[in-house]
């Protein structure tokens, strides 16, 4: 009986540890290279122990070229320090990023509805070239919603922007977790 109890206790402790470690959960869902996995675990541990490192770590990760690592750092920095703590650092580093890193930042802006970084979204949507970053800017504008973004997207469609087709596609696929006001605005703008 004692052996069964000790096994159950060990199992419950393992489940609790797994539930408290978001890094482990995400690594199971998305297979990555072993060295990237180790880097992500280290970053997660550093951020959990010292959230003040988040802005610096995000900048370094975004400039580093390892996209999986950069997204993991951005996610865990967001969870530990909060998105608003990262705004200033992201705004400063954004112009020097690769197109792929800019896209990752724009998806993050859209998911977090960071109006403090609206200018970055505006510039991406106004781009006259179709790139990963400009498509992510459209996504961010749709996710953020609001009259400004809806007018921006509508203006792109009317002007015949190369992004018009992507804008219309995304307007038709608004996420179910968006609030009703965003869904209504998108529906009314069609």
Predicted regions and their residues:
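Sec-dependent signal peptide recognition
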Residues: 2-10
């Amino acid at each position: 009986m004692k052996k069964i109890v000790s096994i159950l206790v060990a199992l419950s402790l393992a489940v609790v540890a797994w539930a408290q470690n978001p890094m482990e959960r995400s690594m199971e869902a998305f297979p990555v290279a072993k060295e990237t996995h180790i880097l992500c675990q280290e970053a997660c541990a550093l951020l959990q122990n010292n959230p003040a490192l988040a802005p610096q770590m995000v900048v370094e990760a975004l400039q580093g070229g390892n996209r999986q690592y950069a997204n993991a750092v951005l996610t865990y920095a967001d969870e530990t320090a909060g998105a608003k703590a990262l705004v200033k650092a992201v705004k400063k580093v954004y112009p020097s990023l690769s197109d792929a890193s800019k896209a990752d930042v724009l998806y993050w802006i859209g998911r977090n509805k960071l109006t403090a970084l609206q200018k970055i979204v505006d510039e991406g949507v106004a781009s006259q070239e179709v790139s990963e970053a400009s498509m992510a800017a459209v996504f961010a504008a749709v996710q953020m919603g609001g009259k400004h973004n809806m007018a921006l997207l509508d203006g792109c469609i009317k002007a015949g922007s190369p992004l018009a087709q992507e804008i219309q596609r995304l307007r038709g696929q608004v996420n179910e977790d968006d609030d009703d006001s965003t869904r209504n605005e998108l529906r009314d703008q069609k």
